[in-house]
Structures are given as structure tokens and as C-alpha cells.
């Protein structure tokens, strides 16, 4: 089967699906779950027991902490975005998009959830699941790379075609896919968020043995991306940097780190979602508030508004 041609300069889930599946008879591609239902579609309410996860779901694990955050938001706000499903059998439906909302709704004690039922073939369901997950904000770089590779394998895409489908640059897609070349130990550090994309990119310039050694030290010592880049350059040039030199010690023993961790925990508890504080050596930094979907974001905004009024 020939690969469908990809349209230029299109972004977003629906357009990415057009790129993968092509348009059939001018029909529109199913929209992302953030969009309103299509004309003629009816918002339905189903029992949570009538739904089951999709066999095409690429996410292997779901954070219990984040599910609990979403459950708290659903208790307060309800399920804002309907779950997209397709009918499997009489009174049984497969989740196409929204498995986290379904699981969190059950944690919140709900027995019913809002859904939109669509007629979708397997190929469309695979594409929707993969693209939606790739475009999520909370995926770590390795999960993104694995989902991209599966997308490429499922639809026999080039890197450029995959980039077009998910709204990324070709270079970004190629860089992510290179992470799959890293040794297992480094990939584990990426999955556990002990290393970031920038760290991994620097390590790709080294042999697997040197990369594994430097990755462990970087995770243990809390090195910045710039520090790892510097040391990788030294290794590549044939120099063997002292991993215990003064610069490393100053980075590893920064007194602010325990305080930063404590502040992150306090803010996360107050806002009901993950909060990260990136504190630089100059005293400057940034505060990052994570949210996994609009339900969590609404909960954060409600808490902030309540404190502002109070």
C-alpha cells in the first residue's frame, strides 16, 4: 500500500491525521478531544463500567500522583472534556482518547462520564492515539521518541513525514529518535527524569561506555546540561576530566537545593499539580507549573483565584 502524500504547513492532531490517512471523499478528520463535537454528534453519558482502554494506547504507565491530581480536579469541576469512544459491542465501548479522564473519574467516585461516540477504523484509532500522546506536554523525551518510532513503523513514514504529522521540525524528530540509541541505563535515567533531553543529546557524542559513566555522575551530582556538554567535549577531545573537581563540588553541594525541593513540594500541594523550580547559580530562575490537560489547569486557576480573593 502506497503511503499517502503529506500536505505542507499543517499542524495539530486533526491535520496530522489528514497527513497520515488522507482525506476520504472530503470528509473531515476527527478533531482532537479539546474541540467541540462535530455537527450532528450527540454528547452522551455512559457508565464507567461500559468503557475499556484501547489496545492501541502507547502509554505504558500513568502516574498515580497525576491521576490523583486530575481526580481532585474532577471532583471540583466535573469532567470538562468528553471522552472519545467507539462502539465495540452492545453497551461496550473502547476509549479512543481520554483514558486518563476515565481512570481519574473512577478515582473521584464517578459512575458516569460524558462521551462522544464515533465510528472509527483501527488505522484511525492508531493514528489518533499516537499523535495525541506525542503532542502531550507531560511525556518525557524517551516516551516521545518511542511513540514517534511506533508512528513511523506503523505508517512507514520518513522522519520528515512524521515531523509534518505531529507538527514538529524534522531536526527535532531526528534528535528525539536518536535517544533510542542510548544505553538502557541512560534511558532509565531519562524516564525517571534524573536527566533531561539536553543531557542526553550531549551524551550521544560519546561511546556507550563513556556515556553511561558520565550519565551516572551527572544524575548523582545534579549537573546542569552545560556541565555535561563541557565534560562530553573533554572526553571527545581525548581528555579525561576529574569528575570530583572544584566545579563539580560546587554544583553538587549547592546549599539551596534542599530548600528548593521543599518549596517545590509545598507549592505542588497547594496548587494540586507538579511544580518545578529551576534555580540558577546567579540567583535567577524560573517557576514551572505543570498541567496534563484542561481539567488540571482549571483546578490550578481556581486555587490561585481563591487565594487572590482571600
Swiss-Prot record:
SUPFAM superfamilies: ParB/Sulfiredoxin (SSF110849). One of its GO terms (cellular component) is chromosome. It comes from the Bacteria. Keywords: Chromosome partition, DNA-binding. One of its GO terms (molecular function) is DNA binding. The keyword DNA-binding applies. GO terms for biological process: chromosome segregation; positive regulation of sporulation resulting in formation of a cellular spore. InterPro entries: Chromosome_partition/occlusion, HTH_ParB/Spo0J, ParB/RepB/Spo0J, ParB/Sulfiredoxin_dom, ParB/Sulfiredoxin_sf, ParB_dimer_C. PANTHER family: CHROMOSOME-PARTITIONING PROTEIN PARB-RELATED. Belongs to the ParB family. Involved in chromosome partition. Localize to both poles of the predivisional cell following completion of DNA replication. Binds to the DNA origin of replication. NCBIfam families: parB_part. This is Probable chromosome-partitioning protein ParB. It comes from Xylella fastidiosa (strain Temecula1 / ATCC 700964).
Amino acid at each position: 500500500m502506497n503511503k499517502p502524500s503529506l500536505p505542507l504547513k499543517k499542524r495539530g492532531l486533526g491535520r496530522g491525521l489528514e497527513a497520515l490517512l488522507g482525506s476520504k471523499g472530503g470528509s473531515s478528520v476527527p478533531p482532537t478531544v479539546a474541540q467541540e463535537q462535530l455537527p450532528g454528534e450527540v454528547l452522551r453519558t455512559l457508565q464507567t463500567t461500559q468503557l475499556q482502554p484501547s489496545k492501541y494506547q502507547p502509554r505504558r504507565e500513568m502516574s498515580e500522583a497525576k491521576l490523583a491530581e486530575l481526580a481532585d480536579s474532577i471532583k471540583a469541576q466535573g469532567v470538562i472534556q468528553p471522552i472519545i469512544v467507539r462502539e465495540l459491542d452492545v453497551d461496550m465501548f473502547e476509549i479512543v482518547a481520554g483514558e486518563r479522564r476515565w481512570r481519574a473519574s473512577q478515582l473521584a467516585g464517578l459512575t458516569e462520564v460524558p462521551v462522544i461516540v464515533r465510528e472509527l477504523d483501527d488505522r484511525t484509532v492508531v493514528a489518533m492515539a499516537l499523535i495525541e500522546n506525542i503532542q502531550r506536554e507531560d511525556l518525557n523525551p524517551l516516551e516521545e521518541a518511542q511513540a514517534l518510532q511506533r508512528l513511523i513503523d506503523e505508517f512507514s513514514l520518513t522522519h520528515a513525514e512524521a515531523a509534518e504529522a505531529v507538527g514538529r521540525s524534522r531536526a527535532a524528530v531526528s534528535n528525539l529518535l536518536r535517544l533510542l540509541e542510548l544505553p538502557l541505563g541512560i534511558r532509565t535515567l531519562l524516564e525517571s527524569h534524573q536527566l533531561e533531553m539536553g543531557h542526553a543529546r550531549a551524551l550521544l557524542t560519546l561511546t556507550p561506555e563513556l556515556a553511561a559513566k558520565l550519565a551516572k555522575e551527572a544524575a548523582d551530582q545534579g549537573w546542569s546540561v552545560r556541565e555535561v556538554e563541557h565534560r562530553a567535549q573533554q572526553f571527545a577531545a581525548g581528555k579525561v576530566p576529574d569528575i570530583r573537581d572544584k566545579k563539580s563540588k560546587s554544583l553538587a553541594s549547592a546549599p539551596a537545593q534542599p530548600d528548593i525541593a521543599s518549596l517545590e513540594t509545598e507549592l505542588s500541594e497547594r496548587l494540586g499539580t507538579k511544580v518545578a523550580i529551576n534555580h540558577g547559580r546567579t540567583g535567577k530562575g524560573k517557576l514551572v507549573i505543570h498541567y496534563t490537560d484542561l481539567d488540571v489547569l482549571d483546578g490550578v486557576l481556581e486555587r490561585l483565584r481563591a487565594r487572590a480573593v482571600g
